């Protein structure tokens, strides 16, 4: 039986939390094509639906991809445009991991027609559903807030030098949301000095933040990148670690509450 493309729990607040990289499902026949290095799916945003599960009780809509980012990357521009010029990002269908290991066995790398097929089968339906949720929330409230949630290992030399701060908030340099929304998010995330915070630093926002964040139309988007060491053991990322996750969840609760309660100022 084919897995659905997303887990979707609809809420009644203006907030939508999108988690595009936590999926681990592979379509039939895909696993056999992967290299030994790629089969553990090392670039997965592990356990983010668990980390944010509380948000549904605050009225947030929660949408999370079920399929691995190695099938297709839902936070990449399908036309190949990069939102991080000069950074060696993986593409719509990656052929190497963040550690430069080959994802596919020899002779199994997808060709252009296979990449286009994945775009049509997986990328487009997922974004159609996400756009529908944003439109529904906007129609109900007059504005919508998208939190595009991600996580990553603390050190990924391919993407950045040194250790990434614990929490990285991106607003496309202020273009994807109202300034007061970004400030509300900063205040919520900065309340606990345990976790270091960066705002529009190395992480500014990927495809979803750039595409859906149109504040002049009442559509606001933020990208949050969480260092995985803040909520799990990076040596064993497949294991959920409640002892590490719970303190971070307290910070994320403040963030979710701030985004749910935020309202644009009347013109």
Q: What is the role of each PLM region?
A:
Residues 1-146, 151-267:
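N-terminal catalytic or cofactor-binding beta/alpha core of small enzyme domains
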């Amino acid at each position: 039986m084919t897995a659905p493309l997303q887990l979707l729990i609809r809420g009644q607040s203006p907030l939508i939390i999108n988690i595009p990289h936590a999926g681990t499902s592979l379509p039939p026949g895909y696993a056999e094509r992967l290299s030994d290095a790629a089969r553990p799916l090392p670039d997965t945003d592990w356990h983010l639906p668990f980390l944010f599960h509380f948000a549904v009780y605050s009225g947030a809509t929660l949408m999370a991809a079920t399929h691995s980012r190695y099938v297709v990357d839902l936070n990449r521009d399908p036309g190949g445009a990069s939102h991080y010029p000069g950074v060696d990002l993986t593409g719509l269908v990656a052929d190497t991991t963040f550690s430069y290991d080959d994802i596919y066995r020899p002779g199994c790398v997808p060709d252009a027609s296979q990449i286009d097929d994945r775009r049509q089968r997986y990328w487009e339906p997922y974004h159609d559903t996400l756009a529908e949720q944003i439109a529904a929330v906007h129609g109900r409230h007059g504005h919508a807030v998208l939190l595009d949630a991600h996580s990553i290992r603390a050190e990924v030399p391919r993407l950045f030098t040194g250790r990434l701060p614990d929490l990285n908030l991106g607003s496309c340099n202020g273009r994807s949301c109202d300034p007061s929304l970004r400030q509300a998010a900063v205040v919520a995330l900065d309340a606990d000095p345990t976790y270091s915070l960066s705002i529009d630093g190395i992480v500014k926002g990927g495809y979803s933040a750039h595409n859906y964040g149109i504040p002049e139309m009442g559509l606001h988007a933020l990208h949050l990148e969480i260092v995985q060491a803040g909520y799990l053991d990076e040596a064993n990322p497949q294991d959920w670690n409640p002892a590490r996750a719970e303190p971070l969840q307290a910070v994320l609760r403040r963030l979710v509450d701030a985004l749910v309660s935020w309202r644009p100022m009347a013109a």
